[in-house]
Amino acid sequence: AANVFIGMVESPLFIRAYLAKLSRSELFTVMTAGMATVAGTVLALYAFVLGDVIPGAAGHLLTASLISAPAAIMVARLMVPETAAPTGGGELPPTPYESTMEALTQGTSDGLKLFLNIIAMLLVFVSLVALVNIVLSALTPGDRAPWTFEGMVGVILSPLAWLCGIPWAESSAAGALLGKKVVLNEFLAYLDLAAASEEALSDRTRLILTYALCGFANFGSLGIMLAGFGTLVPSRRNEVAELGLKSILAGLLATCCTGALVGLMSTAGLIG
């Protein structure tokens, strides 16, 4: 529930005392929920970007996050089924701090460490994407437009866009937006969505993509998540890294399920 309003790093703080005890499936569910939603702090920015092409953009984006939260749980449980006993709430462990001042200083130190780790991981993942694009550009034959990693991912995701209810004629452009969202981030994808011509994308397709793009499932967010969980629960750093790429896929599938639902409602005349 917290993921709908705050970020993927802040929301696990609500259950920090239980992070080390979560089963593998529960941990993956927490990761997927972070990938399938966006923080309330950026909703206003995205609504401003889409305001001219999507009537009531703010309401659609908030609804997208609300619907994608249960969708994330569904997809996560299907991809990593529960095999252990569910983690109960129980009693919180006693606080390790003996005074308010000790808690304040330790919290400040942990916060700074978390911030620096996030910055470092984000730089590394963005740099890796840039490096791949440089290599692909050098391998591009003839006078063709330079190949990019996000472009290739977009081609792969075109059938997924079609499964969301987007017409096949528009699936290539929609897949390109999904690819940009996964490789780079959803903000750049929303900018392209707002700039797309009416000939390229119909109003219904724009509405579906508004929901399908509304999530943090991208490589930069993976770096942020690895840094965040690595600081909050160091004992499970390797497990989080193993589940990282799978959580991006799960988050993308969750938002696409939301987009498909909106597409069905639009076809039935219930929305749009």
Whereabouts are the PLM-identified features?
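Juxtamembrane inter-helical linkers in multi-pass membrane proteins
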Residues: 1-14, 84-103, 149-153, 177, ...
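Alpha-helical membrane segments and immediately flanking helix-loop junctions
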Residues: 1-50, 174-261
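Loop-to-transmembrane-helix entry motif
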Residues: 25, 107, 111-122, 243-251
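Hydrophobic core segments of alpha-helical transmembrane domains in multi-pass membrane transport
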Residues: 36-48, 64-80, 121-134, 157-160, ...
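Alpha-helical transmembrane segments
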Residues: 57-75, 207-215
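Long, contiguous bundles of hydrophobic transmembrane helices that form the permeation core
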Residues: 66-112
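Alpha-helical membrane-protein architecture signal
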Residues: 97, 101-105, 153, 171, ...
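Transmembrane helical segments that form the transport core of multi-pass membrane transport proteins
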Residues: 109-198
